[in-house]
């Protein structure tokens, strides 16, 4: 007859808790959180948003089965000089973004902080251009300031 896998006594709570804590290290999300790996490898360094300068406009081809050129920009972040690709949302949104503009980017909202939908390798999206919301520009509520 084989023994029990876990203690089942009246005073076994501490032992059970310690055992559970030990096995948490086999969970991916726990390891990433405890070792602070997001801050280490994320270009935004764990921040929800970041400021950057537009280097160029690029068209990224959509994944199968879709066929489109998703309008994106290459952005150099101010805080660490890293270059990332950010999606410019809305129909005609790219018309409000020019090279050398200052933009604010945020995560695009894909699973586990990755790319979303049919846009391969793009993890961020543009939310502001030269201090004005891209949505306000697109709706015609505000004018884009010249810097």
Curated annotation (Swiss-Prot):
Q: Which superkingdom does the taxonomy of this entry point to? A: Archaea
Listed SUPFAM superfamilies: Nucleic acid-binding proteins
The signal peptide here is: none
Query: Does this UniProt record's set of keywords contain Cell inner membrane?
Result: no
Tell me a GO biological process for this protein. translation
Identify a single GO molecular function assigned to this protein.
rRNA binding
Q: Which InterPro entries match?
A: NA-bd_OB-fold (IPR012340), Ribosomal_uS12 (IPR006032), Ribosomal_uS12_arc (IPR022863), Ribosomal_uS12_euk/arc (IPR005680)
Give the GO cellular component terms, alphabetically: small ribosomal subunit
UniProt xrefs under PANTHER family: 30S RIBOSOMAL PROTEIN S12 FAMILY MEMBER
What this protein is reported to do is described as: With S4 and S5 plays an important role in translational accuracy. Located at the interface of the 30S and 50S subunits.
Family, similarity comment: Belongs to the universal ribosomal protein uS12 family.
Could you describe the subunit structure of this protein? Answer: Part of the 30S ribosomal subunit.
What is the protein's given name?
Answer: Small ribosomal subunit protein uS12
The organism encoding this protein is Aeropyrum pernix (strain ATCC 700893 / DSM 11879 / JCM 9820 / NBRC 100138 / K1)
| Organism classification | Archaea, Thermoproteota, Thermoprotei, Desulfurococcales, Desulfurococcaceae
Gene label: rps12
């Amino acid at each position: 007859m084989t023994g029990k896998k876990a203690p089942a006594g009246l005073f076994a709570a501490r032992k059970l808790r310690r055992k559970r804590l030990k096995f948490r290290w086999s969970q991916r999300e726990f390891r990433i959180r405890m070792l602070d790996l997001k801050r280490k490898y994320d270009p935004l360094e764990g921040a929800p948003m970041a400021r950057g300068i537009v280097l160029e406009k690029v068209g990224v081809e959509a994944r199968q089965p879709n066929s489109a050129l998703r309008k994106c920009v290459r952005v150099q972040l101010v805080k660490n000089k890293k270059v990332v690709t950010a999606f410019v949302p809305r129909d005609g949104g790219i018309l409000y973004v020019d090279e050398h503009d200052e933009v604010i980017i945020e995560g695009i909202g894909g699973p586990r902080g990755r790319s979303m939908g049919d846009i391969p390798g793009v993890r961020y999206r543009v939310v502001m251009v030269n201090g004005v919301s891209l949505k306000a520009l697109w709706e015609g509520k505000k004018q884009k300031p010249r810097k």
